[in-house]
């Protein structure tokens, strides 16, 4: 299935849903990108993996969510939680502080086509291509940090 890129301004952020990122073999992965409203250059925090960028943390991982809220009750402070996803830093907390948040569905997962091949050389190359893409965008200052629990 093909997904169309959609951009909008919502909740004080520029959000691009299903951002295409072309890999070295021509396959296009899909990402969601959350940016500050200003036209500056910002550092990027990226997550990448098979956990489906469109799956809410609270809905898709109920037991982990419950344990997190019990252990760290302030998790929701300053957030509506509507953009929270597994392994993604909360855009509502980081974007206002001047970061771009990028969440990429890996090959064959979520909104990205292809066949999942976890921890393979192909997946490593895809991740590399995504990092390089993020570091060279007009809104990026070239610094790309990675976030994840298992990825």
Tell me what each language-model feature is.
Residues 55-67, 79-90, 106:
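The serine-hydrolase catalytic nucleophile loop
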Residues 139-151:
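Alpha/beta-hydrolase fold nucleophile elbow
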């Amino acid at each position: 299935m093909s997904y169309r890129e959609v951009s909008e301004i919502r909740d004080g952020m520029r959000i691009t849903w299903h951002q295409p990122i072309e890999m070295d073999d021509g396959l296009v992965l899909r990402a969601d990108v959350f940016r500050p409203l200003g036209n500056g250059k910002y550092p990027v925090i990226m997550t990448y993996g098979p956990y489906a960028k469109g799956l809410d943390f609270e809905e898709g991982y109920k037991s982990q969510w419950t344990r997190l809220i019990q252990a760290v009750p302030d998790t929701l402070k300053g957030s509506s939680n509507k953009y929270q996803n597994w392994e993604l830093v909360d855009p509502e907390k980081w974007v206002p502080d001047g970061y771009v948040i990028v969440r990429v569905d890996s090959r064959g997962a979520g909104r990205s086509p292809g066949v999942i091949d976890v921890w393979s050389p192909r997946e490593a190359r895809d991740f590399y291509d995504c990092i390089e893409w993020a570091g060279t965008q007009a809104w990026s200052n070239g610094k790309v940090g990675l976030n994840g629990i298992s990825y």
